[in-house]
Structure formats: structure tokens, C-alpha cells
């Protein structure tokens, strides 16, 4: 066994252990964390540490496993792959490995981690006696579990909290059995656990008949806040505070209504209590409100008042412009922010209405004028290109809207432009993907319009159509995708990241 760059495993464990310690020393737990012990369990978030430590799902699963006495340890794709955060053991030492896969590319990262650890990514190539049991969960496992059938022994669909006690009990009861099939049959009894380890065809048939459905955590039954606060998270020194799951909006491009319904809002009293308890226990500079749309949460103003009274700043995971109020803008300004982030999706009023956002460019300008009067100086706008029914005029309207904001309101403006990817289970799931070449053509049309109307130095970031194509392929892939996924992982390992 060798670590990175050929470092002997013992020395590598010491070296990378010290690196992890330099990261974890800045983690402050908001609740007491039990030691845990049995079984030994690798909890993998196949993305970078900053992203993973900002994911409330990872916090919740880790804490619940700890409370059940499980010896759970965290792994991330970077900066130190395949070495656990807690004890600095290699991934292959753990008999149980579960991955929380939030986004499509993370599935590739997980395959890469398994491969680097010497664990065959394909389930059929793993020896039940010599290799760990592999599970998958997370948002992507609910969006497209079919793609994971050739990889995972079992797949948890929906929220993890209602499933974990059953999962732990079953693993403790059957994990020492020589015949793993008894364990897999036990797991298959749960309505939210899909078990491809009993056969891919059976699992596909189960999905087609709708016999397995995502588990749902009732409002108020989750922890409701982050387990750690660390400056190394994607949000900085922030306490994550959950307000709701699911969404009432039903935008046709979004997976939330289809895969993560129903809407569940945490009672305001519970949210306030969690905030007060955490603020009395650990230091943090701001509160991150975790919700699909903060403006839909009842009692938001009361919560913002409480956050302000504690001397904390606030950040919103999402802001819908038609929900934006002076009170919300004031909270951002009082937190030291001068920039606002919104997602008009398109510059066309009619196309935006089709997207489930029936507000006009005029209403956007009115709301931003209010925000400017409240102290906001800049706005970042998110758009999609390749939407169903989109014309070149719709694409050019993005530049027109940006120009109207900058010239009419004298605000700083930046754009983030992404390629629309149809997702399974959504109303627009059956719409065609625009394709790499056409996305690039529309990007060029928009770039020319921006240069002509706003100047070549105007700040606009365009996501890669090639990456969107990969996301689309993974979103709709079946178990056969493991063939080209493995090929891509091997090319990545050889440094050929752009080869698909």
C-alpha cells in the first residue's frame, strides 16, 4: 500500500494526518459528538472539503451515525483523497463505504476514489469477502438511481434520517455473515432502499414499477442546523440553519418538486431555539439560511430580527426577486454586503414565465432600484441558455437586461451563464438537450452582444457546454454507463481531463 507520490503508507498516513489536523483544528462542533465504534463506516463526500463541509446532509448523516454508536469517519475527494479525516486511515480499511452524491460529476469522483483505493468500482467485480460493502445516497441517488446500479450494492433514496436506524441495525445483524445475500435481502425490505446487489434487472424493474420511493423526513425531526462551524467551508465562518425542504413553486426545470416533495417548513420556534443554542455554544460570524427560497418561509422577518439581535450576519442560499423585501436587503447590508445575487434565468419576459417565474424585466428593475436605495451597489445575475423554445432574440435579451440594470440603475453587474440541462422527473425532462455546438453558438451570440453594448471588460462567466453535456449524460444514464465512466476516470488519472 502506498500513499500519494509513492509515499509508503505508514509515512503517508502520518503526513496526511497532519494535513487533516490542520483543517479539523478549525472545526468547532455545535453539539457533543459521541465517539462511536461499531461498525467501522466510511462516509464519503466525493467533492472537495469546502463543498462537503457546507452540505447539511453530510452533517446530519454523520451526527446520526455517531449517536447510534457507529465508528463513522469522513472522506473527501480533495484535498486529501482516500485518507479519513478522523483517524487518517485509508478508505480500503473500512468494511462499509457509503457515498453522499449531490451532483452528477460527483459520481465520477466516487469511482475515482474507489479505483485509487484498489476497490473495483463495478459491483460484479468485487469479491464479497475481500471488498467493502458499497452504498450510495444523496440527491443524485434520488434523481437518477439507475446510473448507480452497476456500482453500488445498495442505494438509499430520499432523506437519510428515516432510513439510517434500519440500515445500521441490519448491518450490525448481518455484516458478519459469510453470505452477504442475507444482508442484501434484509436491506431490500425497506421501501426506500434499492438493492442492485440482488440483480440489476430486478432493481430496474423495481424502479419502473415505482415500488421504491424516497424517504421523507417530517418537518422538525431533523437536527435543523450544522454540526460544525469552520472558516474552511464554502460559506466561511457560518452556522447553517435549515428552514425548509421541498418547494412550493414547481418550476419546470427544477428537480426539487419532483424528487424532494412535499414542502416541509420547520416551525419558527424550533429554528429560533436552534439558533439561540448554537450561538451560546460556539462562535460564528454569520447564519446561512438553508432553504430553496427564503422569501417563502413564514416568520422570516422575526428570524432576521433575532439574527440581528445576536450580532450575526446573514446569507441566503437563494433569493427570488419577486419575493425580495427591504427587510431582506437590510439584513444583507447590515452583514457588510453590497452585492445581491438573483436568477432571472432569461432576459425574455415570456420565456421567464414559461420557467415558472412570472415577473417581468420591469419588475426586476423596480426591485433592484429598491435594493440600490437600501445600499446594494452590485448585482450578480444567473441565466440559462438552451431553454425549451428559446430563440436568438431571447439570448440577446440577456445582454439587454444587463445593460438596462447597469445604465439605468448605475449598479455594478456581473453575469453567470449556464447551459440548461433537462433532468429526470421534471416537466421539462423530456425536452432535448441543446448540445455542445449549439450552446457554444448561442454563447458567442451573447458574448458579441455584451461586447457591443457593455464593453469587452464586462464581467460575464460562461459555464462549459462540454461539462453540461457530461451532466446531461450522467443525469439520464443507466447501469451501462459504467463502461464509459470507467474509461473517463482512467483518462483523468492519466491527466487527460478533457477527454470524454
Model-assigned labels for residue ranges:
Residues 14-42, 49-50, 194-240:
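N-terminal [4Fe-4S]-dependent radical SAM core
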Residues 77-202, 427-478, 486-498:
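Glycine-rich beta-alpha loop elements in corrinoid/cobalamin-binding modules
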Residues 1-33, 41-43, 452-500:
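Radical SAM enzyme core and accessory elements
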Residues 49-52, 63, 81-82, 105-107, ...:
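Flexible loop/turn segments at secondary-structure boundaries
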Residues 298, 327-328, 350-355, 385-393, ...:
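Flexible glycine/acidic-rich beta-alpha junction loops that bind and position SAM and/or redox cofactors
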Residues 55, 232-269:
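Canonical Radical SAM [4Fe-4S] cluster-binding loop centered on the CxxxCxxC motif
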Residues 43-46, 96, 105, 273-414:
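Conserved SAM/AdoMet-binding glycine-rich loop
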Residues 58-60, 114, 150-152, 171, ...:
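Short secondary-structure boundary/capping segments
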Amino acid at each position: 500500500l502506498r500513499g500519494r507520490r509513492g509515499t509508503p503508507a505508514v509515512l503517508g498516513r502520518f503526513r496526511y494526518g497532519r494535513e487533516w489536523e490542520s483543517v479539523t483544528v478549525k472545526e468547532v462542533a455545535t453539539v457533543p459528538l459521541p465517539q462511536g465504534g461499531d461498525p467501522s463506516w466510511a462516509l464519503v463526500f466525493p467533492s472537495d472539503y469546502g463543498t462537503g463541509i457546507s452540505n447539511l446532509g453530510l452533517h446530519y448523516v454523520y451526527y446520526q451515525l455517531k449517536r447510534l454508536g457507529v465508528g463513522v469517519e469522513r472522506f473527501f475527494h480533495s484535498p486529501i483523497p482516500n485518507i479519513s479525516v478522523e483517524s487518517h486511515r485509508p478508505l480500503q480499511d473500512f468494511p462499509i463505504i457509503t457515498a453522499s452524491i449531490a451532483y452528477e460529476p460527483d459520481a465520477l469522483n466516487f469511482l475515482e476514489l474507489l479505483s485509487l483505493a484498489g476497490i473495483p468500482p463495478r459491483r460484479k467485480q468485487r469479491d464479497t469477502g475481500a471488498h467493502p460493502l458499497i452504498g450510495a445516497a444523496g440527491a443524485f441517488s434520488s434523481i437518477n438511481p439507475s446510473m448507480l446500479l452497476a456500482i453500488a450494492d445498495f442505494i438509499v433514496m430520499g432523506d437519510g434520517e428515516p432510513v439510517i436506524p434500519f440500515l445500521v441495525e441490519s448491518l450490525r445483524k448481518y455484516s458478519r455473515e459469510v453470505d452477504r445475500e442475507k444482508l442484501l435481502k434484509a436491506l431490500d425490505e425497506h421501501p426506500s432502499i434499492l438493492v442492485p446487489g440482488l440483480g440489476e434487472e430486478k432493481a430496474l424493474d423495481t424502479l419502473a414499477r415505482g415500488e421504491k420511493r424516497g424517504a421523507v423526513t417530517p418537518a422538525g425531526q431533523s437536527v435543523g442546523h450544522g454540526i460544525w462551524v469552520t472558516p474552511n467551508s464554502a460559506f466561511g465562518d457560518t452556522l447553517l440553519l435549515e428552514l425548509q425542504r421541498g418547494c412550493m413553486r414547481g418550476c419546470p426545470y427544477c428537480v426539487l418538486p419532483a424528487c424532494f416533495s412535499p414542502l416541509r417548513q420547520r416551525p419558527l420556534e424550533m429554528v429560533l431555539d436552534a439558533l439561540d443554542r448554537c450561538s451560546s455554544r460556539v462562535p460564528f460570524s454569520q447564519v446561512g439560511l438553508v432553504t430553496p427560497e427564503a422569501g417563502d418561509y413564514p416568520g422570516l422577518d422575526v428570524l432576521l430580527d433575532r439574527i440581528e439581535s445576536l450580532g450575526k450576519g446573514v446569507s441566503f442560499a437563494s433569493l427570488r426577486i419577486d419575493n425580495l423585501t427591504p427587510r431582506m436587503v437590510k439584513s444583507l447590508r447590515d452583514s457588510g454586503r453590497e452585492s445581491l445575487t438573483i436568477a432571472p434565468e432569461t432576459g425574455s419576459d415570456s420565456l421567464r414565465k414559461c420557467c415558472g417565474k412570472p415577473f417581468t424585466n420591469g419588475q426586476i428593475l423596480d426591485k433592484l432600484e429598491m435594493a440600490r436605495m437600501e445600499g446594494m451597489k452590485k448585482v450578480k445575475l444567473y441565466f440559462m441558455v438552451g431553454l425549451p423554445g428559446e430563440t436568438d432574440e431571447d439570448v440577446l435579451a440577456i445582454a439587454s437586461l444587463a445593460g438596462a440594470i447597469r445604465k439605468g440603475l448605475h449598479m455594478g453587474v456581473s453575469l453567470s451563464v449556464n447551459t440548461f440541462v433537462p433532468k429526470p422527473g421534471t416537466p421539462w425532462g423530456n425536452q432535448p438537450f441543446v448540445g455542445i455546438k449549439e450552446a457554444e453558438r448561442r454563447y458567442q451570440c451573447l458574448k458579441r452582444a455584451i461586447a457591443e453594448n457593455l464593453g469587452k471588460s464586462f464581467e460575464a462567466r460562461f459555464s462549459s457546454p462540454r461539462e453540461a453535456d457530461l451532466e446531461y449524460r450522467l443525469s439520464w444514464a443507466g447501469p451501462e454507463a459504467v463502461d464509459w465512466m470507467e474509461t473517463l476516470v482512467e483518462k483523468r488519472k492519466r491527466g487527460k481531463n478533457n477527454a470524454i
